C-alpha cells in the first residue's frame, strides 16, 4: 500500500512539472509581453498572440487562434523560417493544442491524488489504475502534438532567433514526463495485481 501511494505521488509530481512547462507557454506574449515562444525581428510570438518591440511597443489582442504569419518581418527574415507563411498560418491554428494539453496535464496531476483517497485496501483497484493510465496516454499524445506544433511554428534558421534553450528544455520536459508517468503507472498496475494474487493464495 505504501509503495502504491508513493508511485501515485511520484506520478503526480512528474505531471506537475509538465503542467508548469505548459503553463509557462500559455503565459507568453501578449499576456506577459517580454515572454515568447519565439522572437524574430522585434516580434515576440506567444500562444495567444504576439508583441512587437521594434520601433514602438504594441501587442495583439488575446485570441484563441491567431494568424502567426500576419506580421511580415522586414528584409529577408521572412525566408529564414523553417516553414512557408502559408504553412505557418495553417499550423498556427493548431496552437489551441497548447491549452488543451495544459488542461489534460493538470487533470493528470490531480487525479492520482484523488485515487489515493479512493484506493480500497483489499479491494479491486484495477479499474482506477486503468482509467488513470488511459488518461496519461491521452496526455502524452497531446503533449507530443503540442510540442511538435511549437517547434514547427517557432523554429527559425537564424540561431539568434531560435527559441531559447530554457524554452526548449521545458518542451522536452513536457513531452518526456508524461512518458515516464506511463511507465510509473505500469509499475503501479503490477503492484496492485501482485498484491491481489498474494491475497488469493494466502
UniProtKB/Swiss-Prot annotation:
One protein family per Pfam: SUR7
Signal peptide (residue range): 1-18
Highest taxon, organism lineage: Eukaryota
Free-text disruption phenotype from the record: Leads to lethality in absence of CDC28.
Keywords for this protein: Membrane, Signal, Transmembrane, Transmembrane helix
InterPro entries tied to this protein: pH-response_reg_palI/RIM9 (IPR051380), SUR7/Rim9-like_fungi (IPR009571)
One Gene Ontology cellular component: growing cell tip
Membrane topology classification: Multi-pass membrane protein
Keyword check for Membrane: yes
PANTHER family in alphabetical order: PROTEIN DCV1-RELATED
Name of the protein: Protein DCV1
Species of the source: Saccharomyces cerevisiae (strain ATCC 204508 / S288c)
Amino acid at each position: 500500500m505504501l509503495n502504491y501511494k508513493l508511485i501515485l505521488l511520484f506520478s503526480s509530481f512528474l505531471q506537475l512539472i509538465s503542467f508548469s512547462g505548459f503553463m509557462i507557454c500559455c503565459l507568453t506574449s501578449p499576456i506577459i509581453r517580454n515572454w515568447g515562444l519565439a522572437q524574430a525581428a522585434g516580434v515576440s510570438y506567444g500562444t495567444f498572440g504576439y508583441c512587437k518591440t521594434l520601433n514602438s511597443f504594441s501587442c495583439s489582442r488575446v485570441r484563441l487562434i491567431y494568424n502567426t504569419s500576419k506580421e511580415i518581418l522586414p528584409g529577408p527574415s521572412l525566408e529564414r523560417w523553417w516553414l512557408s507563411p502559408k504553412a505557418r498560418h495553417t499550423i498556427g491554428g493548431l496552437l489551441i493544442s497548447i491549452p488543451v494539453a495544459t488542461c489534460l496535464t493538470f487533470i493528470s496531476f490531480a487525479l492520482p491524488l484523488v485515487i489515493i483517497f479512493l484506493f480500497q485496501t483489499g479491494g479491486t483497484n484495477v479499474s482506477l489504475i486503468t482509467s488513470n493510465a488511459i488518461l496519461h496516454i491521452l496526455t502524452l499524445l497531446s503533449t507530443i502534438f503540442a510540442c511538435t506544433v511549437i517547434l514547427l511554428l517557432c523554429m527559425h534558421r537564424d540561431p539568434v532567433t531560435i527559441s531559447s534553450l530554457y524554452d526548449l528544455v521545458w518542451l522536452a520536459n513536457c513531452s518526456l514526463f508524461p512518458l515516464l508517468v506511463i511507465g510509473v503507472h505500469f509499475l503501479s498496475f503490477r503492484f496492485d495485481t501482485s498484491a491481489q494474487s498474494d491475497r488469493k493464495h494466502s
